[in-house]
């Protein structure tokens, strides 16, 4: 269904200070994996055009697809990395294109842990690892639990990836602590069965996420760091523990005290039929985060629901931004359309993950109205 904005949202188009960035509106391009990197995890040459297309409205924030921090963090083929010189140079071109359009861009950095394809890892000489030897799904082979030295190495790899991102010009990094990847595997008791300082209770399960965050802060500064969490997501065996709410309340409170640039809360919808969550607009955790630092909300918002959430649910908050993922893929001029009441374009989900091709990636047009304005 094509979604047409009812009317421009005044709050959605208010400026927002986010770390070192002065956003001119509160529409954010959320991270979306699209498998457009080569076998060496280097973004393909046309990736820079994709991000440049979506840097269509000056002062916007774009967040890249999930980007691997080191070779052993890679969970799937054709996902980009940011550890090698060649990868970094490709990202430098992306950043340059986005900055030329007067927009901001953060690099989302992550490690997959037990969500990685074990055959891919084995072909590259690595093992599937996690916080504990707990399989993501029944019948799957359990990963190996990381030891202390390996945990510390991952923490330092996150910090180095952040340094690499800033060196090539990114405005900051978003630490991916969501969707059942490695940080989430430490945070949630459904996976983390450790009895040492990295597990066993709420503070210990939050320790890895916080140690990674502090290492990244020490590397690049708190005002260049965001964190993405998805407390309600049940992807990859997550979101089913009894103390989920107090676990994430504790983690979010600690992140707030670290003074990072923003918190990103996502209700991930990886299946077409997944449309509801216990707390679809994240109120439980936004109340903990508070009103002083920016929070990005994502999870299936469209041209109707985004203004409603920011104008009604969060009428008393002046720190909320809305993330769009799939609609930003299909609608490169999304902010312009939202502001001018122009329908967002339908997306073709079947082409989102077609590896290495421009189809479903670069072939969504701008609106005629946007092209007239630009000319």
UniProtKB/Swiss-Prot annotation:
Name of the coding gene: ifgGI
Stored InterPro entries: Aldolase_TIM, OxRdtase_FMN_N, Oye-like
Cofactor dependency: FMN
Sequence similarity: Belongs to the NADH:flavin oxidoreductase/NADH oxidase family.
Keyword Protein biosynthesis in record: no
Record: residues binding FMN: 31-33, 66, 108, 176, 228, 300, 325-326
Any one GO molecular-function label of the UniProt entry: FMN binding
Keyword Thylakoid: no
The reaction(s) this protein catalyses: dihydrochanoclavine-I aldehyde + NADP(+) = chanoclavine-I aldehyde + NADPH + H(+)
CDD domains: OYE_like_FMN (cd02933)
Regions that span the bilayer: none
Pathway(s) the chain acts in: Alkaloid biosynthesis; ergot alkaloid biosynthesis
Binding site for substrate: 176, 179, 353
EC number: 1.3.1.100
Key words of the record: Alkaloid metabolism, Flavoprotein, FMN, NADP, Oxidoreductase
Residues annotated as catalytic: 181
Function field: Chanoclavine-I aldehyde reductase; part of the gene cluster that mediates the biosynthesis of isofumigaclavines, fungal ergot alkaloids. The tryptophan dimethylallyltransferase ifgA catalyzes the first step of ergot alkaloid biosynthesis by condensing dimethylallyl diphosphate (DMAP) and tryptophan to form 4-dimethylallyl-L-tryptophan. The second step is catalyzed by the methyltransferase ifgB that methylates 4-dimethylallyl-L-tryptophan in the presence of S-adenosyl-L-methionine, resulting in the formation of N-methyl-dimethylallyl-L-tryptophan.
GO BP terms: indole alkaloid biosynthetic process
Protein name: Chanoclavine-I aldehyde reductase ifgG
